[in-house]
Amino acid sequence: MDLDMITRQFPYADLQLNFHEVGQRSAFPTIILIHGTGGNTDKHFSYIFPMLGIHQRVLSIDLHTPDKADLKVTDFSQQVEALIQYAVAEDETITVVGYSLGAVIAAQVAASLKQRIARLILLAGWAKTSSVQQLRTTIWQQLFTEQSAALPHFVNYCLYSDDYLSTRSEQQVLDLARFVKPSQDAAKQRELNYRIDITATLPDISAETLIVACREDRMVPVAQAKLLFASISNSRYIEISSGHALYIEAPAEVVQLVNQFSQHPQQYPANQKIQPSMP
């Protein structure tokens, strides 16, 4: 990541949680990044984070997974709210960007803070876990419990698009397994993923919202993004050519979309499906 990045801490309950900062406050909104399941700033935003910092102030949280049963989305969204309270001035405009589970958390933050959040960008997010997603999570949990050598390959099959994988040899695809490092925190987050349902909170979102779907996503099907689009007023929808790992397959496009919508939302009319500028 960018050498000018600053890592700091903020108080939450009786903890000190890490967040990262890059860029300077400007005429554009300050961006808050929220990573996905089993991730952190480095894993999910290593390219996106510093590139966004060229034009505006960007904060990225490393979420803490509480050691408790029956996690709730608010166990994470309240961490983001605490970061905003600690690190963002009252007169700073805010754009919240969430990826995957981070998109679910971002939606919860926007619903809770209402007008405090000016813009909301949901990357590969969902509102209510489908039976297909539950099946995939069940397989993941079983492979994790068994410490199966097949788990990293299953994760990569779900994570990447056919186009991304098919450009690599069989051995190169198998070698991707070395980047998958499942953890107990990820397992607890996936248990939460199994029962996500934020549909009742979506009408409370007042932020101008951009919903980004990944056309070849095996983890979060496009239908989930369409449900978000139908449920959030003042939203617009775009599909990009990528699997779930858009931070690897389409990072430049993500940076472009986030910059354009955060800085110039008037270019994206509400309640419209937007055509991507990249093929």
Label each PLM-derived region with a short phrase.
Residues 46, 59-95:
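Active-site loop/oxyanion-hole signature of alpha/beta-hydrolase fold enzymes
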Residues 98-102, 106:
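Gly/Ala-rich beta-loop-alpha elbow adjacent to hydrolase catalytic centers
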Residues 205, 211-213, 217:
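Short beta-strand/loop motif that positions the catalytic acidic residue
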Residues 242-255:
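Catalytic histidine-centered segment of alpha/beta-hydrolase-like enzymes
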Residues 131-134, 149-201:
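Conserved alpha/beta-hydrolase catalytic His-Asp/Glu region
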Residues 215-220, 245:
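Acidic catalytic loop of the alpha/beta-hydrolase fold
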Residues 11-67:
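Conserved HGGG/HGGXW glycine-rich cap/lid loop of the alpha/beta-hydrolase fold
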Residues 107, 111, 118-147:
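Flexible "cap/lid" loop of the alpha/beta hydrolase fold
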